[in-house]
Amino acid sequence: MATKQEALAIDFISQHLLTDFVSMETDHPSLFTNQLHNFHSETGPRTITNQSPKPNSTLNQRKPPLPNLSVSRTVSTKTEKEEEERHYRGVRRRPWGKYAAEIRDPNKKGCRIWLGTYDTAVEAGRAYDQAAFQLRGRKAILNFPLDVRVTSETCSGEGVIGLGKRKRDKGSPPEEEKAARVKVEEEESNTSETTEAEVEPVVPLTPSSWMGFWDVGAGDGIFSIPPLSPTSPNFSVISVT
């Protein structure tokens, strides 16, 4: 069905073709202009504009996303746990958290020698390495081959056996020193007794003790000397020139 505007346009064309154009324009000017305007508006070319949204070109879209460079802290905790859980040769962990070091002596049918208790497994492993190197030399399998230090004092077998013994207190002297001190004290007591026996008792000075020195006539004392005479052999004449 034709719309009202189309019907008016057809009517206008038929009147324009069949009737006089001038008379129509003069008789109905408003109708003519309205119909003409409607006709041009309907039949005129239409411009269609495609409005596409412009992409927002921002700096964030041009740059690639940066990688996440955050270092996780769990790596350090894992390494510490691995060191604690690592099993060292000759080391056993106690239920209360300490680490005990032991070694088997091949010279005594494989009997165990207790090397001590340590706070960490690394210290216990190093104690085992020193004892193993002393017993087996270069053939020993060690936990830390580069950390072993051999000295002249620890190379002897007595040092290895002494590792299992507990350290003596610094305040208590050894038994040998005690025995030496006892001997010295006995010798000093013997020498003091002999000196006391050899020393004569000292007589106190009294008037009676001086009578021997001054009693010349009795012939007892230091002044009991016979008188000198020219005929006596002790007499000598000194000639003075």
From Swiss-Prot:
Query: Basic and acidic residues bias located where?
Result: 78-87, 170-184
Main location group: nucleus
**Which SUPFAM superfamilies does this chain map to?**
DNA-binding domain (SSF54171)
- Bias kind Polar residues: ranges: 44-61
InterPro entries registered for this protein in UniProt: AP2/ERF_dom, AP2/ERF_dom_sf, DNA-bd_dom_sf, ERF_plant
Where does this polypeptide localize?
Answer: Nucleus
Q: Which cysteines are joined by disulfide bonds?
A: none
Q: Name one GO biological process term.
A: defense response to fungus
Matches recorded under Pfam families: AP2 (PF00847)
UniProt keywords, alphabetically = Activator, DNA-binding, Ethylene signaling pathway, Nucleus, Transcription, Transcription regulation
Segments of this protein annotated with the region Disordered: 37-87, 162-203
Where in the sequence does UniProt note compositional bias of the Acidic residues kind?
A: 185-199
Q: Give yes or no: UniProt keyword Oxidoreductase.
A: no
Q: Which GO terms describe its molecular function?
A: DNA-binding transcription factor activity; transcription cis-regulatory region binding
State whether keyword DNA damage applies: no
Gene Ontology cellular component terms for the protein in this record: nucleus
- The superkingdom listed in its UniProt entry is Eukaryota
Residue ranges for the DNA-binding region feature of this UniProt entry? 87-145
**PANTHER family xrefs:** DNA-BINDING DOMAIN (PTHR31190), ETHYLENE-RESPONSIVE TRANSCRIPTION FACTOR ERF105 (PTHR31190:SF499)
Which purpose does this protein serve, as stated in its record?
Answer: Probably acts as a transcriptional activator. Binds to the GCC-box pathogenesis-related promoter element. May be involved in the regulation of gene expression by stress factors and by components of stress signal transduction pathways.
What family does this belong to?
A: Belongs to the AP2/ERF transcription factor family. ERF subfamily.
Name-wise, this protein is Ethylene-responsive transcription factor ERF104
Q: What organism does the UniProt record list as the source?
A: Arabidopsis thaliana
Q: Source taxonomy lineage?
A: Eukaryota, Viridiplantae, Streptophyta, Embryophyta, Tracheophyta
The primary gene name is ERF104
